Amino acid sequence: MSKLKKTDGKYLWWCLLCLKFKPDNVSVTKTTKHLNLGMNMFDKPNKEAFYIVIHFLFNKLNPTRAQDVFRNCWLVWDHKSDAEFRKVAFAWLQEIANEEGSAFPKVAASHLLSAFGPKFINLMLHLAKHVMLKTMKTFNTDGMWVPEAAAVPASSEEMELKRFQLVKRQFQRVTVEQDFLIQDYQKRAKVLEKSLRDLDAENAKYDSLLKEHDSITDLKEVILAKVQKLRGLWNEVDRFLSNHQGKRDIVASVINGQVDQYILCGQELNVKMPAALRERMERPSHQSSAVRLYEGGQPVLVRLLALLNEGLHVLREEREKIVGPSVQLQNQDVQEHALLFTRSKENLNLIRWKLVKEDAAEIKVSIGKLEEEWECKWANCLKNTPLTCFLEEDPVLDLVSPMVALSFEPASEASFQASVISQYPCKPHDLLEQPSKEKLDTTVAVVHLEQEVHLKPEIKISSVATEDQDVLVPSDSCFSPEHVTCGTPPCETILSVIETPSPKQPCHTNLHSKPKASVLKTKAQILDLECDNLASQFADAVIMSPGNQRSDVDLGQLLNAISDPFSSRKQLCRTPESLIKDVRSSWRKAVEEGLAEKKQASWNQQDSLSWLKTPMANMNSPCKTLNLESSMSFSTNLDNCTSPPVQQGSTLHSTLSWDSSQMEVLTSQCSSDVIKFSIAQEEPPDLFDVSFNSDSSVENSGEKARDEELCLPSVGLCYLDETPQLTEQLCLGASSDKSVFKDSPVHLSMSKDLSHWTTDHFSLDLDRLESLSSPPRAENLTLPNLVNVNLDEY
């Protein structure tokens, strides 16, 4: 019976696998951790397996009906859904059993209550076979063959032959697969049998080892218990023996024969009693205790001890009767010592008062004088030598290293050794006494460089302040055209464009230049060279950024700092921003003083607008051509080639540094040698920001015009009715794109030699500066006056 039960369970599991049952992808209840699916799943009650198998078979038989019937009880979550599931399954099983010609066994409700046992397994096996039969009848792969058609008689021999061949092929395929399965099963069985025998042998071996280990463990436990018991007995014996050690010694002495070996004999003992003790013993109070000390010629030890005790009492009483000598204090000696100590204390207090009142004041005064002398010495020392020279081993390394123009990279070791800083002290004393002379020399050097500024193009920079830093944004530019003669047309092709360098882009062309061997010079020569070098640097910085709007410092303070370039207490700033900030005010003051002296000469000249009234016919024909595409410059070369005079009292609206008349005074040249420029070289103001009314533009500009006032020349007033062509040119210039000015001759005004000299001149290397030659003399250029165009009358 058990064998049949196992066989039915195995067949049931195989049928489920043939129907594509996947035990890994099932879920029936909330907790499926202990789900048991396999051949022995119904050996014990297994509700979860019952739910899964029944639902799978009914869903395989009729999916639509199964979904409709089990929609309220699948998945099974509680007792209510469990009862509903059993009810639906029982009804469906009864329908299958009641079909005609069905061999399905009789179904009872009790079969579904306990999902285990042979009857339940047999019921599930018949249900699985029924589902397999229904599935086989509906099997169709290509729509050409149905199993039920095999029972229909063949219509011809060919059809019967085809059926036979089809069945034969299927039978052969199944047979081959079955044979392959059997062979594979046999191979695996052999391998498993061998491994099973090995495992059995290993299991037997480990069982024997386990038994031996258990027996040894038990034996050790028995031995350990006996040892503990024996140790307890020995402890008890030791405790008993220690308590009866005296008795043991007596027994041992008796056993060893040590009894009666020693006898206390007092025959030779004679007791002598003092008179005081004898009298005491003869008193009536001691008569009762008075006994004989000898009995049978031997002294009695107990009585002798009692007599000794009485003798001790007598001795104590006699000692109490004796009175010892009394201690007498010598008060006179103590008083003498106290008086001596008091006098010594008064003398010490007197000495202390004298030290505090007299000597301490003198010592403090002397200490103060010494401190003042030390402070004076230290201050004088610091004036001559910086503090960092005392703190470091090499004081020269603390100074500013020689650098190229606007470069913050340190120079090489060879440059350090050849520099002036390594050969001369940090602060020459003989030059400190002549600050006024150095200041005057520096001022003259700055004014002397005024004529060199005309050789470079000027760009107006408007400062735009942001939260983090000041960004220089270029605005309207002032262009200086190339030299135009009457025989050369102004539309000449421009071959190269050289942009004006920015002060924020330091030049690094001579970063690796090797310094020459230093020649010994006097301190005055070194100072003069350094001042000239710094003045040239200041001029270049002011030309590159005339629009830097920052707080100005006093020229006197700046020149005092320049007078001693090697002073470590007040070193010069080595950043482009700080150089421009410190130089700008001093340069403006120098230019303002020059302008004030030269403005007197320009007031007596003729009206500045007289040159505009010159008829256009007097001009040469090549000079009349306007080339907007190539240079965007409107250049009019006058016949007389004289610079236009400046009208006295005219408003300042020019972005140029100074006019042509001022250049004539500085360069001491005649006006006929100077090239004239027209208004076309000036960019008109922005129509959205500044109106064409020059008077209102000055009022709206505010602080910006105040900063540019020092470098603006006097400009005459012009009306559009007098110069219609000039107004047309101005409108064309304002509407044209500013990007075209990149090819204008202003970028060609700075030649290669001049740009190289201005780039390399910004250096603190005096040897290298001495070797440099003066900049090549470029063509003398003058800048025209701007014309105020007033549209109010039109």
Curated annotation (Swiss-Prot):
The keyword Electron transport does not apply. It is found in: Cytoplasm, Cytoskeleton; Cytoplasm, Cytoskeleton, Spindle; Cytoplasm, Cytoskeleton, Microtubule organizing center, Centrosome. It holds the Pfam family HAUS6_N. One of its GO terms (biological process) is centrosome cycle. InterPro entries: HAUS_6, HAUS_6_N. One of its GO terms (cellular component) is mitotic spindle microtubule. The keyword Nuclease does not apply. Component of the HAUS augmin-like complex. The complex interacts with the gamma-tubulin ring complex and this interaction is required for spindle assembly. Belongs to the HAUS6 family. This is HAUS augmin-like complex subunit 6. It comes from Danio rerio. The lineage of its organism: Eukaryota, Metazoa, Chordata, Craniata, Vertebrata.
